Amino acid sequence: MASNMDREMILADFQACTGIENIDEAITLLEQNNWDLVAAINGVIPQENGILQSEYGGETIPGPAFNPASHPASAPTSSSSSAFRPVMPSRQIVERQPRMLDFRVEYRDRNVDVVLEDTCTVGEIKQILENELQIPVSKMLLKGWKTGDVEDSTVLKSLHLPKNNSLYVLTPDLPPPSSSSHAGALQESLNQNFMLIITHREVQREYNLNFSGSSTIQEVKRNVYDLTSIPVRHQLWEGWPTSATDDSMCLAESGLSYPCHRLTVGRRSSPAQTREQSEEQITDVHMVSDSDGDDFEDATEFGVDDGEVFGMASSALRKSPMMPENAENEGDALLQFTAEFSSRYGDCHPVFFIGSLEAAFQEAFYVKARDRKLLAIYLHHDESVLTNVFCSQMLCAESIVSYLSQNFITWAWDLTKDSNRARFLTMCNRHFGSVVAQTIRTQKTDQFPLFLIIMGKRSSNEVLNVIQGNTTVDELMMRLMAAMEIFTAQQQEDIKDEDEREARENVKREQDEAYRLSLEADRAKREAHEREMAEQFRLEQIRKEQEEEREAIRLSLEQALPPEPKEENAEPVSKLRIRTPSGEFLERRFLASNKLQIVFDFVASKGFPWDEYKLLSTFPRRDVTQLDPNKSLLEVKLFPQETLFLEAKE
């Protein structure tokens, strides 16, 4: 039985030779032939490429034999009925459909997206960029090709490019924007961001890293250590400018190209180790010739070259881990997982939640019922032969990505390393119980990847479904939709319960508010009554004080009055009769020589102060209080007797 690594190599060779792009179909055909590469190719090529195969004893059609350069003409023959025989095409060979390639081209602070068929040339890309950037083709250097510099006449198909590509434009003949002084230029560079395109030589992987101009070369090397696990002292660099002689130098003054600069990093190693690693990546595929010595035609006749035949196998050997071993911080581990997943399978993939599993629970379950979602946990395993198929064909399908984004929170973990596997099983046992943990623990490698669908409940988290990697897009979508139906039914109940609970809480809040308003109204009435009583008390006190003051004044005036003269007196006597507003009369005798003020004091001593009342005489009618109080009664003609009236002043 072929190992997992051998299977990936066989699968890559089988797809390259047959041109079958559907990985599910390729695996099915290989499994039918017990992973025998030659038998599988013999069984597929007649149907897929329109080539007839001779039967036992059948008459062979005259024609030239297939003579690959790798087999001499004197090679021993075989009588196998499955051997390749000279054939003539019975129908037209199916032509390869042109691929659509996506290019993102960066120039200074602009990004231009270009989509072309792989039958186009590099020059056609430049023509499009000339219209977009207004830069003549003759002044333009298009960089970023993995194979180095290419000619404008190079056909894209011959470069064997992936679907998504990143390029950048350099214009060395065009003057860059000038600054007023060197200090100003340096300050401007310190504020700029440099894109460093760093190629990891051993694994043939590119990292696009952004650094500010104030970052140092040492900081770049430390960041590269975090990504490649190559210590700074073991890093072997290519591409630094000659002026970058000190690791403490900032990028702005190191002479890097702006906006992007290409660098290459590798591990310092002996030539013998390098040769040994190269030899381990070489894979030979031997075909069996028939009894007549006919050989299998070269793979280039099928439209693929050696790089396409062995590229997938070499790529598999150079894979970077999805997660660092013994990952301490789940957020950092998932950042690396997302970056590596994108580099392998493209940018069209589910949005993986960056954070701990507990944080994913909070995001999915511990919100309002209307905002809750299902939690999908993707468990990756690099050693499973199904991983590449599941990720590229199913998990990255646009329909799956869209459905997951709308209805799920997607969290991922890599179980390839034993330490990471043990850590996830611990989390699984804590959150889902020992039964689910044991189920995952007993899964075989070839049953991965797994897709767990989790629904949050009031007291626990329920695993609705465990989807294994040997599925199809339609089946995966059906199982996701089935889980969504269960979740929707539960969500409707939760929404109803939540609405009822919120209604009860609203009623309680309204009652509490009404009670509070009632208490405030009672308190306001009580405070108003208290203020009224206090005001009445204050006014009463003022009134009493005024009465006491008036009484004191009255008594003092009464005591200050001269004694009333007798009727028979040697001096002239004036008798005054004063009518009060109530109709009563006040009578008293005064000496004719007494001043008018004494009359006023007498009236005031009876409770009628002269500043509040006025004295009026009848004949003639006059206001006595307007007369001079220092004149005598005789002078004001209130002698020998007079009747006066008291009247309140207005």
Swiss-Prot record:
Signal sequence, start to end: none
Compartmental location: Nucleus
Xref: SMART domains: UAS, UBX
GO biological process: apoptotic process; ERAD pathway; Fas signaling pathway; negative regulation of canonical NF-kappaB signal transduction; positive regulation of apoptotic process; positive regulation of DNA replication; positive regulation of extrinsic apoptotic signaling pathway via death domain receptors; positive regulation of protein catabolic process
Compositionally biased tracts (Low complexity): 68-83
Record's subunit section: Interacts with CDT1 and ATPase VCP/p97. Interacts (via UBA domain) with FAS (via death domain). Interacts (via UBA domain) with NLRP12 (via DAPIN/PYRIN domain).
Keywords assigned: Apoptosis, Nucleus, Phosphoprotein
GO molecular function terms listed in the Swiss-Prot or TrEMBL record: heat shock protein binding; NF-kappaB binding; protein domain specific binding; protein kinase binding; protein kinase regulator activity; ubiquitin binding; ubiquitin protein ligase binding
Function (record text): Ubiquitin-binding protein. Required for the progression of DNA replication forks by targeting DNA replication licensing factor CDT1 for degradation. Potentiates but cannot initiate FAS-induced apoptosis.
Family annotation (PANTHER family): FAS-ASSOCIATED FACTOR 1 (PTHR23322:SF96), FAS-ASSOCIATED PROTEIN (PTHR23322)
Domain UBX: residue ranges: 569-646
Phosphothreonine modifications at: T580
CDD domains: UAS_FAF1, UBA_FAF1, Ubl1_FAF1, Ubl_FAF1, UBX_UBXN3A
Residue segments, region Disordered: 62-87
UniProt name for this protein: FAS-associated factor 1
Gene Ontology CC: CD95 death-inducing signaling complex; cytosol; endoplasmic reticulum; nuclear envelope; nucleoplasm; nucleus; ooplasm; perinuclear region of cytoplasm
Residues recorded as bearing Phosphoserine in the entry: S320, S582
Organs and tissues of expression: Most abundant in testis, slightly less abundant in skeletal muscle and heart, followed by prostate, thymus, ovary, small intestine, and colon. Not detected in the peripheral blood leukocytes.
Domain UBA: 1-57
Cross-referenced InterPro entries: FAF1-like_UBX (IPR033043), FAF1_2-like_UAS (IPR049483), FAF1_UBA (IPR044541), Thioredoxin-like_sf (IPR036249), UAS (IPR006577), Ubiquitin-like_domsf (IPR029071), UBX_dom (IPR001012), UBX_domain-protein (IPR050730)
